Design a protein with these regions (language model features):
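N-terminal leader segment of winged-helix/HTH proteins
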Residues: 1-55
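N-terminal helix-turn-helix DNA-binding core of bacterial DNA-binding proteins
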Residues: 41-91
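Alpha-helical linker/hinge and terminal dimerization helices associated
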Residues: 68, 102, 131-142
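Conserved beta-strand edge residues that scaffold enzyme active sites
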Residues: 69, 112-113
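Basic amphipathic alpha-helical segments that dock to polyanions
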Residues: 70, 92, 96-102
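Residues within the helices of the helix-turn-helix
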Residues: 78-79, 97, 117
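A short, conserved structural fragment
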Residues: 100-110
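Basic, amphipathic "hinge/linker" alpha-helix immediately C-terminal to the N-terminal HTH DNA-binding motif
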Residues: 113-132
């Protein structure tokens, strides 16, 4: 049995401190833009619709869990992802294909025996996880 992951508390503390600074900057920038523009209901609708595909993809069950697992392990095989997350093979296969199709992960097949399939984050996938971490930690804080 492996020891529990100890980076979580220290990492959370560091991320939360940096996140507070980033949030202030984003809030300031956002408010500056909003003050300069009059947003119509159509503008608002168009903005939300332009992000709908990303909302649907990233907030589906298992998507962020898979990406988070990959950032912690760098490269990882199908079986290890399945065991780590407790997801069934069919669902995991579908999610991995979807994440690969949208450019978040790569799939590398190494000829065997045994045949080995490993997954890794692309730059887009890594950046997405790094951007999601503050949201995840902030949302899970008590």
């Amino acid at each position: 049995m492996s020891a529990p992951l100890t980076l979580s508390a220290e990492f959370r503390k560091t991320v939360e401190a940096q996140m507070a600074q980033v949030l202030r900057g984003i809030d300031y920038t956002f408010n500056q833009i909003i003050e300069k523009q009059k947003i119509t209901p159509k503008d608002l609708k168009d903005e939300v619709e332009s992000l709908q595909e990303t909302f649907n993809l990233l907030f589906q069950k298992w998507s962020l869990e898979i990406l988070y697992t990959l950032i912690l392990k760098d490269t990882i095989g199908f079986g290890e992802i399945k065991k780590t997350l407790g997801v069934n093979s069919r669902t995991l296969s579908d999610k991995l294909k979807m994440l690969q199709t949208y450019g978040y992960i790569t799939r590398d097949v190494t000829a065997g025996p045994p045949l080995r399939v490993e997954y890794a984050l692309t730059v887009k996938g890594k950046n997405t996880v790094l951007l999601a971490l503050p949201l995840l930690y902030y949302s899970s804080s008590k």
